[in-house]
């Protein structure tokens, strides 16, 4: 029960990142516009008082402000897309649900435009609808409901006379119905919830604000490894606390209040739950990176320098800390606890110094300049001496503890072989043993990239053993294990099934090819090779592919391809090496030795070949642009979670992969180069 709830919370936290990612762009527009309208910048640059410049500044402020004014609908759309695997139908359903919910609540409560004049009654004008103000929480609820409707009904089958409304078209219909029903209990119970949130947040701040900001910083940092920090900070940033703007509207949430006060040029009272990040991200963590570099073994310092410089710059400029934090989190968890304590103390220190700083994305230098220095509404310069002190503390604490406890931070690892030597014929037996034996197997399956096993007891699975046998990654979702063995996954599954049934009793009877289990093919002799688009469509970053195996590069680097036609073509001159039985994936090797996997859609293995027609055979030579596969795009859109098609280099090793800066492509467009 707990594991299932934890997994759902992680998914929600990740989904919140999509709407949050919009805020930096809005904040940039707002910050620049506000700075040009402010007296501080006008004093040094008097020419910006020009009417045309001020008109542009006003438009910039308005363009940024409109995003913050409509955060509830943005969160509804973003959460729906995030929880539905990126499908736009969920966003349409969320929009339908959002307007129906607000219209129905407004009508049920008899909210009229006249009642909006008193903001204390909890009413607001939402997209032109006089209704009950549910804020960002209301948007998140609608987004989650839309995603539930999508995941529940996207492949529903209806009688033939209602066939037009089957599949994804049924999702907005269900969302309209459920949001209409939801409006009545929401209208009744939400005022009580809102009053409770207000009382809690105001009581928290009034009783001991210093303790509150310390605990916020400390707990938020501790939740990062679990991916739950987005859920934790959302109420503080978007709901807790209130402030009345010049128009008499009640603004809720520390971040929203900060942005509104910056926009109006008002006295700053907000930022308590944001400002503590600046000394840590701009000074503390980069100093920790220096300590990690200096404690690395001499022979590893060159590699560690590259890693730490990149991570430190990322933290300093943007406030993105995960690349640096995850370099020591798992090998030295005590260091991370110390880091969390220092983070909380940073919040407390800036609160005691009466500094009021905020951000739209994170506590990096970019936000520090745009929303701290340029508006010049608070003692922003105090961050610098506090940050210098923090840099000294982080450096010496990290260096001392790393050496004292011999933490295996980057560059200090013990040398050891990462792959167990095993014959190809023995591999299925060893994998079965690592999965806990045949008694532990509840369900066995595979696709072209991974072995999918549902086990009875996850504690019996030897994850490290699976990796030592050649798995490039192991995903754990409840009792479902996914071991990434690449193209040999289906062969391993086939032999494991026969071992379990008793048809195979010794390694010599396995069918897995010897060459498949050898060490990865080396590519030292590969000459520069251009890889072309596998069809007409759009290129997206691999990180946006809604499947961790691909987005986290467990299979290798590459891109995501969103096809807009029903034909997949060869990306280079070469040979077809593998066609999966369900035809949803194809492996190719270029004449120069580059191996590429084209995985058409996400979870399309479950379609059992429906919607795919192979035009080539295994071991058949192909030329760049030659059709490989016909796909029924509409069928895939209706029955697969996503049509995004990862195109992966599976034998890159130490070669350099350059991804071209292109978006809309056709088969004659180069998308990657490896050399």
Curated annotation (Swiss-Prot):
| One Pfam family cited in the UniProt record for this chain | PTS_EIIB
Give the residue range of the signal peptide. Answer: none
What sections of the protein cross the membrane? 16-36, 59-79, 81-101, 126-146, 170-190, 211-231, 273-293, 303-323, 328-348, 355-375, 378-398
- The question of whether Transit peptide is a record keyword is answered with no
All residue ranges annotated as the PTS EIIC type-1 domain in the record = 3-414
Q: Which residues form the active site?
A: 447 (phosphocysteine intermediate), 599 (tele-phosphohistidine intermediate)
The record places domain PTS EIIB type-1 at 425-506
Q: Some GO term, biological process aspect, for this entry: which one?
A: D-glucose transmembrane transport
One cellular component (GO) term of this entry: plasma membrane
Q: Tell me, what is one Gene Ontology molecular-function annotation carried by this entry?
A: protein-N(PI)-phosphohistidine-sugar phosphotransferase activity
Q: Which residues form a coiled coil?
A: none
Q: Which reaction does it catalyse?
A: N(pros)-phospho-L-histidyl-[protein] + D-glucose(out) = D-glucose 6-phosphate(in) + L-histidyl-[protein]
List the PANTHER family: CYTOCHROME C-TYPE SYNTHESIS PROTEIN AND PTS TRANSMEMBRANE COMPONENT, PTS SYSTEM GLUCOSE-SPECIFIC EIICB COMPONENT-RELATED
The function of this protein is: The phosphoenolpyruvate-dependent sugar phosphotransferase system (sugar PTS), a major carbohydrate active transport system, catalyzes the phosphorylation of incoming sugar substrates concomitantly with their translocation across the cell membrane. This system is involved in glucose transport.
> What is the protein name for this chain?
PTS system glucose-specific EIICBA component
Record the organism: Staphylococcus epidermidis (strain ATCC 35984 / DSM 28319 / BCRC 17069 / CCUG 31568 / BM 3577 / RP62A)
* Gene giving rise to this polypeptide: ptsG
């Amino acid at each position: 029960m707990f594991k299932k709830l934890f997994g759902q919370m992680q998914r929600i936290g990740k989904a919140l990142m999509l709407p949050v990612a919009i805020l930096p762009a809005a904040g940039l527009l707002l910050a620049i516009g506000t700075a040009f309208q402010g007296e501080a910048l006008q004093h040094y640059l008097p020419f910006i008082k020009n009417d045309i410049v001020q008109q542009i500044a006003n438009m910039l402020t308005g363009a940024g402000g409109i995003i913050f004014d409509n955060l509830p609908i943005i969160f509804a759309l973003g959460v729906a897309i995030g929880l539905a695997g990126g499908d736009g139908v969920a966003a349409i359903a969320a929009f339908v649900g959002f307007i129906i919910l607000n219209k129905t609540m407004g009508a049920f409560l008899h909210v009229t435009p006249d009642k909006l004049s008193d903001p204390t009654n909890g009413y607001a004008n939402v997209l032109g609808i006089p209704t009950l103000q549910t804020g960002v929480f209301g948007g998140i609820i609608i987004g989650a409901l839309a995603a539930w409707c999508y995941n529940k009904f996207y492949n529903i089958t209806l009688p033939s006379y209602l066939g037009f409304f089957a599949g994804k078209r049924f999702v907005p219909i269900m969302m309209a119905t459920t949001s209409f029903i939801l409006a009545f209990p929401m209208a009744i119970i939400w005022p009580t919830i809102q009053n409770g949130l207000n009382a809690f947040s105001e009581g928290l701040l009034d009783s001991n604000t210093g303790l509150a900001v310390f605990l916020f910083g400390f707990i938020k940092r501790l939740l990062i490894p679990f991916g739950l920090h987005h859920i934790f900070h959302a109420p503080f940033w978007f709901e807790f606390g209130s402030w009345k703007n010049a128009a008499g509207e009640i603004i809720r949430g520390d971040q929203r209040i900060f942005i509104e006060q910056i926009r109006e040029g008002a006295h700053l009272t907000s930022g308590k739950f944001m400002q503590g990040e600046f000394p840590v991200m701009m000074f503390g963590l980069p100093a920790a990176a220096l300590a990690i570099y200096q404690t690395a073994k001499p022979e590893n310092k060159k590699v560690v320098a590259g890693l730490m410089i990149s991570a430190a710059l990322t933290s300093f400029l943007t406030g993105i800390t995960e690349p640096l934090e995850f370099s020591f989190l798992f090998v030295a968890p005590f260091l991370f606890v110390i880091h969390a304590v220092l983070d909380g103390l940073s919040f407390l220190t800036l609160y005691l110094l009466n500094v009021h700083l905020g951000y739209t994305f994170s506590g990096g230098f970019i936000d520090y300049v745009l929303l701290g220095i340029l508006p010049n509404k608070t003692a922003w310069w105090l961050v610098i001496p506090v940050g210098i002190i923090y840099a000294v503390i982080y450096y010496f604490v990290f260096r001392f503890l790393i050496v004292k406890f011999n933490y295996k931070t980057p560059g200090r690892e013990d040398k050891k072989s990462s792959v167990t030597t095993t014959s190809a014929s023995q591999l299925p037996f060893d994998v079965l043993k690592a999965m806990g034996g045949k008694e532990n197997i509840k369900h066995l399956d595979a696709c072209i990239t991974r072995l999918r096993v549902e086990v009875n007891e996850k504690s019996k699975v030897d994850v490290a053993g699976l990796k030592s046998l050649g798995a490039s990654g192991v995903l754990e979702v409840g009792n479902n294990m996914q071991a990434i063995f690449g193209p040999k996954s289906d062969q391993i599954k086939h032999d494991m099934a026969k071992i379990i049934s008793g048809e195979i009793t010794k390694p010599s009877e396995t069918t897995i090819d010897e060459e498949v289990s050898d060490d990865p093919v080396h590519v030292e002799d590969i000459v520069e090779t251009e890889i072309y688009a596998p069809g007409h469509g759009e290129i997206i970053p691999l990180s946006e592919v809604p499947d961790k195996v691909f987005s986290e590069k467990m299979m290798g680097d590459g891109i995501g391809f969103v096809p807009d036609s029903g034909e997949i073509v060869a990306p280079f001159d070469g040979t077809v090496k593998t066609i999966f039985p369900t035809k949803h994936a194809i492996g190719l090797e270029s004449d120069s030795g580059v191996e590429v996997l084209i995985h058409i859609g996400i979870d399309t293995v479950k379609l059992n070949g429906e919607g795919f027609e192979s035009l080539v055979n295994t071991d058949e030579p192909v030329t760049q642009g030659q059709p490989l596969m016909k796909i029924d795009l509409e069928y895939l859109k209706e029955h697969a979670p996503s049509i995004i098609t990862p195109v992966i280099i599976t034998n890159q090793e130490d070669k350099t992969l350059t991804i071209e800066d292109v978006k809309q492509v056709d088969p004659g467009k180069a998308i990657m180069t490896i050399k």
